[in-house]
Amino acid sequence: MKQFLLDEDRIPFSEGDTIMQAARRAGKYVPHLCWHPDLGQSGACRVCVVKADDRLVAACTTQVCENMRVENRSTELDDKRRLLLQMLFVEGNHFCPGCEKSGDCQLQATAAEMGMLDLHYEEFYPDRPVDASHADIWIDFDRCILCKLCVRASHEIDKKGVFAIGGYGIKTHLLINSSTGKLDKSDLSADDAAAHICPVGAILPKRVGFLHPIGMRKFDITPIAFETPGADDAID
């Protein structure tokens, strides 16, 4: 079987594999927020940046080739990831102690793995609406990191197209495909993949807030880098 080098470890891969796919199959953690094994490629967050043959690339969109040398967990790359995470934190409302997703949040867990101890940048303090119109699901747009997972899940898995992305630059935002732009008039169901795939606390089910006590939450038990490959990507 063909192999490539990932942080000096020889990793087997199949034809057409991306660096992310081959690494995850081999049990190697590549930090990510917008990648999911059940969805197509996106490259939206760039947290999975690696150095392949001395070029910076996204691990989730770059196909691996034989004898490629990939650098993943280096001080340089983790520093770049930490800067990206800090920008995501200050752009939205990510006050972890007050968020129901705390302890189960992929953004929070990845920041901890990258050694993020402060925000570094000045906070934006956005004032975006909360949509609680749906009977079972609510959205806090201030927490959305524009990973597009809900958009892609709704299109690719649910076949509904409930979500989309609109606007440009700092005004880029999540859209709801309904006559009113509200969730209650959309085709979203509580059991849709799009309703449960959010890696942060932007899309959450109602009536189950703070279900798990501190110490018993997902990433309290197992740090994100030590989970079984794909476990942190499971759709609940």
Name what the model sees in each region.
Residues 1-9:
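Eukaryote-biased recognition of intrinsically disordered, low-complexity regulatory segments
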Residues 8, 36, 139-142:
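Aromatic-flanked redox-active Cys/Sec active sites in thiol-based oxidoreductases
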Residues 11-66, 80:
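N-terminal cofactor/phosphate-binding cores enriched in small/glycine residues
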Residues 46-47, 55-236:
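Fe-S ferredoxin-like electron-transfer domains
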